[in-house]
């Protein structure tokens, strides 16, 4: 049997229409070429073409997941997958596990081997379908799986051994849960007979990760592997996406079995709690509220990442301005005239002004987190609130809405658009005066920065990158000031272009996430905008981008400090430095550590730029150089991310001036 660690939490019961998963029927990834395996010496007899693999991926709807306890038909089986094993041929549990991944459409994994997962790695070498991108640390592997999932919409897969290998996944799993990222993590475990004996490298990873996964499994019967893998992918991407962990004891991996691929999923409780289609009467009520309002604002978050087209159509029909959360960037084009860019602690003045002045707040795919709302009682205090979210636990958790719908945002927007289109000509929606009021705020309080001599303002570096890439690159970041500047100054055009650790704020995320994006979307320009503090936390992944020849570009904004903490020290602790200087105290004139030497050690081309006049050419060279590249951009540590609403503050407390050169 497979011992499920916990039933999927009701708080993660979601609708299935936009991101569900069932065996071999997954979201299309039309631009991803089949991975090359240069080191395979004895490929198995089956060779599937990329077209065959990707043609099996399709988007789920309610109708094709509603009957999860029925057997898969013979027609479905014939269409979805052809095994390299004969139907009655026994094979190891590890081979069953790898084939189960293949049947789910997996073509890339991020796996680091160890004693308890060796069997899985041996099975991976027998696969002609799955490429393993070897990270240099398990945290790099789980963050890469996240980057892959965030960039493609397809669940990322990471694999680690037991004990320290498994515990090294913890930050990535917590990050994926908070940011609703679909990943499947597989861990090796000590043999069943040794569980609970404090065996070498034994860690109860199911217990450790119970509160930071959407669901997890300890597989105690080899025959359960096909069902468990199928359920894991289904859970990871249905409803509100999230991480699922599968813990597989080593003796289960070694056991011979003839798998039953027709096992039904066993998720009756989860299925019964999924949201229904949006209530049409409630949608009509929302349209009525819009027609009655004078100052409506859209507040959109990561929950809108799958419904960008519907969102754009809704804005086109209503003329309502759009403010995005950090996780919502790209769902609506930042450069659009109706975009207010990002709201919240480091959001634009005009976005926060709009929310503060609004009489109707349309909150779509958001959770009213503290970095957006600040002081809850003061947030949108004049507005009626409409909250639509796929997670029922988020509705009313932080802010009580006037109207709420627990539904897939895509379906809700389709319903709203249909109603609006049917009333076109009858509804007289005119918010031009409101938009003009916001334009005044845009002109009065634009995003801006100062220059000092020939030093490179970090904001300017991102502006230049945006210009040279035409706003079309996939951007990953670490966490800190550089992250906020990347959110403010790069103009995101579409979803899955912006990869950042939002809820957890995990430093070290940027480079591994860029690796995942480069693997999943190899035809795109991928740039990791990083800080020296974040970058060095997973600097070992330079070896990965070199060995895998991944064209990841790293633009390092190097200020020799933990910049965001320094900013808070400047503002609230009288600039008292408490272990935030990352350079060499005995020689502050040198750049320490020398990031170029890290790159050189891994064979990655690198350069340093210190003068503003040299920056554009340096960034262009980075973009033009084939393969990976590191550009070390030296920036002043006195810069502050502005605007800033202090933690727990309200819009009236916004800070728009000053930096570390001043006293407070």
Swiss-Prot record:
There are two distinct ALS genes in tobacco. The enzyme shown here is derived from the ALS gene on locus SuRB. Residues 1-91 form a transit peptide. GO terms for cellular component: chloroplast. Belongs to the TPP enzyme family. Keywords: Amino-acid biosynthesis, Branched-chain amino acid biosynthesis, Chloroplast, Disulfide bond, FAD, Flavoprotein, Herbicide resistance, Magnesium, Metal-binding, Plastid, Thiamine pyrophosphate, Transferase, Transit peptide. Its cofactor is Mg(2+); thiamine diphosphate. PROSITE patterns: TPP_ENZYMES. Residues 1-34 have a biased composition (Low complexity). Disulfide bonds join 158-304. Residues 481-561 are annotated as: Thiamine pyrophosphate binding. CDD domains: TPP_AHAS, TPP_PYR_POX_like. GO terms for biological process: isoleucine biosynthetic process; L-valine biosynthetic process; response to herbicide. Thiamine diphosphate binds at residue 138. This is Acetolactate synthase 2, chloroplastic. Pathway: Amino-acid biosynthesis; L-isoleucine biosynthesis; L-isoleucine from 2-oxobutanoate: step 1/4; Amino-acid biosynthesis; L-valine biosynthesis; L-valine from pyruvate: step 1/4. It comes from Nicotiana tabacum. It catalyses: 2 pyruvate + H(+) = (2S)-2-acetolactate + CO2.
